[in-house]
Regions:
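Gly/Ser/Thr-rich beta-alpha loop segments that engage phosphate groups in nucleotides
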Residues: 41, 67, 88, 119, ...
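The catalytic Tyr-centered alpha-helix of NAD(P)H-dependent dehydrogenases
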Residues: 81-88, 118, 122-126, 150-154
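Short, glycine/charged-enriched secondary-structure capping and boundary segments
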Residues: 7, 27-31, 69-73, 122-130, ...
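C-terminal substrate-binding subdomain of Rossmann-fold SDR/epimerase-dehydratase oxidoreductases
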Residues: 127, 133-270
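N-terminal Rossmann-like NAD(P)+-binding domain of SDR-like oxidoreductases, especially those catalyzing
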Residues: 1-115, 240, 245-248, 254-270
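Conserved donor sugar-nucleotide recognition element shared by glycan-biosynthetic enzymes
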Residues: 84, 92, 122, 184, ...
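Hydrophobic alpha-helix immediately C-terminal to the catalytic Tyr-X-X-X-Lys motif of short-chain
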Residues: 91, 95, 99, 129, ...
Length: 270
């Protein structure tokens, strides 16, 4: 009923709502199925009922699984999710596709690479490393730290979504990637250098279950068909992001209070 009341007077639905942290999905898969799959179905029903102009599903490159040392995910790469989180997102994508094919609901799906930027919660790599470094805490790095991610600034992600919303061809999937591949350990060392902290803070911990080795997105389709180009280089974006967290430590402290402390102890202080 709450969702219906929100959707009935809306022109568009853009579904950002999700449980999104892989670590949490390993410890509690059920909430990911409920939120990410069943929650999507509730939104789709409301969008169908009230005839929205378009429904856009915000998804992730993790639905494709993992890559070797070369190659990129394209929109036609088979879905091979390896974690409860990515499985829930892949399932939701398929439900969205079914509503397009069955009910002619006007939809698009976007699949992005790893986001970074202001207001990201400290369970994610970049804000977690910044936060711990500022407090001279150990920086926990899974495995050998050489897992590779393709980093996309949140501003560039939003401009891409706006293009898909207004110009995307109905029923199509669009990959959104920053073409900024970095090993996790490279990111951590960069943050330490920017903050003037010693690399002795780095602590390698047991690797995460089902940890995908490499993600990298081919965003040719959205670039050529919709004219999207990212504004941020990684060098500029990470510098601005670090400064944002330095300037907004009160926000970070508030976010880290309460339940987050229990989560951190469970994940990293075993």
């Amino acid at each position: 009923e709450v969702v219906n009341n929100l959707v009935k007077d809306s022109d568009y639905v853009i579904n950002f709502a999700a449980e999104s942290h892989v670590d949490r999905s390993i410890s509690d898969p059920e909430i990911f199925i409920k939120s990410n799959v069943l929650g999507t179905q509730v939104l789709l029903n409301a969008a169908k009922e009230y005839g929205v102009e378009k429904y856009v599903q915000i998804s992730t490159d993790e639905v494709y699984g993992t890559l070797g040392e070369t190659g990129y995910f394209t929109e036609t790469t088979p879905l091979q999710p390896n974690s409860p989180y990515s499985a829930s997102k892949a399932s939701a994508d398929l439900v969205v596709r079914a509503y397009y094919e069955t009910f002619n609901l006007p939809v698009n799906i976007t699949r992005c690479s790893n986001n970074y930027g202001p207001y990201q919660f400290p369970e994610k790599l970049i804000p977690l490393m910044i936060s711990n470094a500022l407090e001279d805490k150990k920086l926990p790095i899974y495995g050998d730290g050489k897992n590779i991610r393709d980093w996309l600034h949140v501003y560039d992600h939003c401009t891409a979504i706006d293009l898909v919303l207004h110009d995307g061809k109905l029923g199509e999937v669009y990959n959104i990637g920053g073409h900024n591949e970095r090993q996790n350990i490279q990111i951590v060392k960069l943050i330490l250098e920017a903050l003037g902290k010693d690399e002795s803070l780095i602590e390698f911990v047991d690797d995460r279950l089902g940890h995908d080795r490499r993600y990298a997105i081919d965003s040719t389709k959205i670039r050529e068909n919709l004219g999207w180009e990212p504004k941020y280089t990684f060098e500029t974006g990470i510098k601005e992001t670090i400064q944002w967290y330095l300037d907004n430590q009160d926000w970070m402290d508030q976010v880290k209070s309460g339940e987050y402390q229990e989560y951190y102890k469970k994940m990293y202080l075993k």
